Amino acid sequence: FQILLKNGKKKLQIPYELKSRVRRGEDVKGFTSEDVLYLIMPDRFANGNPENDVGDGMREKKVDRADAFARHGGDIQGISSHLDYIADLGVTAIWLNPTQENDMESGSYHGYAITDYYQIDRRFGSNEDFCALVEKAHEKNLEVVMDMIFNHCGSENYLFKDKPSKEWFNYHSNYVQTSFKTASVMDIHASAFEKKIATDGWFTSVMPDFNQRN
């Protein structure tokens, strides 16, 4: 079908394909209390392909295992090559820190400053590499939990740099630090300000907080 965008007398039609599910939603089983999850920070786990340590054209160039805030070179291939080891631990599922693109200047090794929700970070591998990892894990009776972050994104994300309006992000897209005091949300004695700063404040100055009410 066509998506029609209008700006005054200007019109733009964009063809959009709504693809059918490969599997029915009710056939997909999530993790439960029966599972034992093994949390992996991909950049810190194992370097299976040193050639992708510095992604082509990406902002951060530093790879240094002696620097706690730099990239260390771990990737999807490194995880894939250690699946037998992980399975032997007796776990039933792998929980990966976000693997989507984090094209930030520095300090995004953790994966929580996503700049493209549709692309696996090139320093980890490709979208196809990720799918292959999941298939290989399933062959070893391991589930894979994909960590999705929709509370905030990286400031280099196109959704922030080319936002439709400043209301797309909390505090009109201006940096206001969260208090991290989430208990105030349920505290009957907390002020409206305390609750707002806890839920709407930014995680860091380079992780703008999405306005979920928009």
Residue positions per predicted region:
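A short linear-motif detector with a strong N-terminal bias
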Residues: 15-20, 40, 187-191
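Sterically constrained small-residue positions within well-ordered secondary structures
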Residues: 7, 30-31, 108, 201
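Compositionally biased low-complexity segments at domain edges in trafficked proteins
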Residues: 26-54
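Substrate-binding/active-site clefts of carbohydrate-active enzymes
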Residues: 45-214
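Extended acidic/polar, glycine-enriched regions
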Residues: 1-30
